[in-house]
């Protein structure tokens, strides 16, 4: 197959073609085709065990597909690895946020970054301000609600200049008010 995906346009940021994944004899995904354009919000809906999280983990390089292809910005990705996905601008907010409870919000967001701390801080403050969120960067992560923890995870992705943010079951542990707050953040 050529570098172009069937029907792919330059507007598509992420495309998967013919993704199949088996665990033993259990076929979890079979021939999945999906594309996401710039600025698009896409929702995958299905019951438990339908393969939504498996597909997300394949896109992130956590799982290897048995068949299929992945394209990011029109470039075929031949190596399904987390580091490749991150380098190409894909970031996944896990179902259960992975924060360090005794660290501050800012420390959790900036962990793993190198550079001048004040410049990173200023960039983070600008992102938060541009979006209009209110978040105390000095607050300990252990005091955050689940929705606030997911916002911290979203900010991690934004600080990494993610082109694609994948949210794995973002509403599963949230109250109605937290769901509304999270959807507002995603819409912004």
Predicted ranges, named:
Residues 2-188:
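Glycine-rich phosphate-binding loops of nucleotide-dependent enzymes
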């Amino acid at each position: 197959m050529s570098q172009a995906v069937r029907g792919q346009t330059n507007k598509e940021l992420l495309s998967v073609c013919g993704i199949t994944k088996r665990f033993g004899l259990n076929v979890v995904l079979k021939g999945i085709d999906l594309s996401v354009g710039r600025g698009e919000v896409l929702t995958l809906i299905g019951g438990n065990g339908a393969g939504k999280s498996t597909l997300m983990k394949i896109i992130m390089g956590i799982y290897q597909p048995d068949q299929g292809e992945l394209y990011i910005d029109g470039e075929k990705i031949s190596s399904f690895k987390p580091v490749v996905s991150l380098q190409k601008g894909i970031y996944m907010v896990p179902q259960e946020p992975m924060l360090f409870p005794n660290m501050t919000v800012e420390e959790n967001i900036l962990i793993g970054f190198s550079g001048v701390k004040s410049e990173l801080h200023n960039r983070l403050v600008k992102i938060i301000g541009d979006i209009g969120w209110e978040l105390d960067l000095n607050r300990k992560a252990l005091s955050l609600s689940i929705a606030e923890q997911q916002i911290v995870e979203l900010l991690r992705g934004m600080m990494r200049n993610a082109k694609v943010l994948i949210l794995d079951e973002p509403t599963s542990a949230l109250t109605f008010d937290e769901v509304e707050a999270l959807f507002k953040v995603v819409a912004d």
